[in-house]
Regions:
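Beta-strand/loop substructures that line and gate deep hydrophobic ligand-binding cavities in soluble
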Residues: 102-155, 160
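Beta-strand elements of well-folded, non-transmembrane domains
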Residues: 32-34, 79-81, 132-136
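Glycine-rich portal/gate segments that line the openings of hydrophobic small-molecule binding cavities
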Residues: 31, 50, 60-107, 121, ...
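Hydrophobic ligand-binding cavity/cleft-lining segments
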Residues: 4-6, 12-64, 68, 165
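Amphipathic alpha-helical protein-protein interaction surfaces
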Residues: 35, 45-48, 95, 149, ...
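Exposed loop/turn and edge beta-strand positions of beta-sandwich/beta-sheet ligand-binding modules
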Residues: 26, 84, 110
Length: 167
């Protein structure tokens, strides 16, 4: 039986960043009992996103795989009761360490960064950071969006942990 521990201590489970009132800035971490190579191979592959991201419904490569700086991937998600279509462009990719993507098309500018690091016992700490600076009416929703993203990211990392640890 898998038991997920939620704690502000990233060494033992999950932690979530602070709410930014000027925008969205949410960091969520998990420690997964799998090697960095396994966690990166699965979590950095956009084709796997619908399996572990609750809100992502579809993925379409706009450039040919594999993932590299300059790759563009379209996602369709359902978030806060709305259908969102957006395209991420990979702006940084250091395999096994860091992946940063920015929206090149979508409802508002967003940047997502994954980092991975090996921790004791052959485990991996994955950190997922979402930063965005909504404009116009969306700016008024930023505090609510931050809370919703925080909840969604926590669920997503729990699902990722379950999928990888059951392998």
């Amino acid at each position: 039986m898998l038991q997920v521990v939620v704690s502000p201590d990233a060494q033992s489970g999950f932690s979530m960043g602070e709410l930014s009132m000027s925008g969205v800035d949410v960091t969520t971490q998990a420690v997964i009992a799998r090697s960095v190579e396994e966690v990166v191979a699965y979590s950095a592959n956009p084709d796997n996103a619908p399996a572990w991201y609750e809100n992502i419904k579809s993925v379409e490569w706009k450039t040919p795989p594999p993932l590299a700086v300059g790759s563009r991937v379209a996602f369709v998600a359902h978030f806060l009761g709305k259908r969102l279509a957006y395209v991420y462009e990979v702006v940084e990719f250091d395999p096994g360490k860091r992946l940063t993507m920015r929206t090149s098309e979508g409802p508002f500018p967003m940047e997502t960064t994954y980092t991975w690091e090996s921790v004791s016992g052959g485990k991996t700490r994955i950190s997922l950071r979402n930063q965005g600076f909504p404009v116009g009416f969306s700016k008024l929703m930023a505090p609510f969006m931050s809370l919703a993203i925080r909840r969604a990211n926590r669920k997503d990392l729990i699902r990722l942990t379950e999928l990888l640890e059951q392998k």
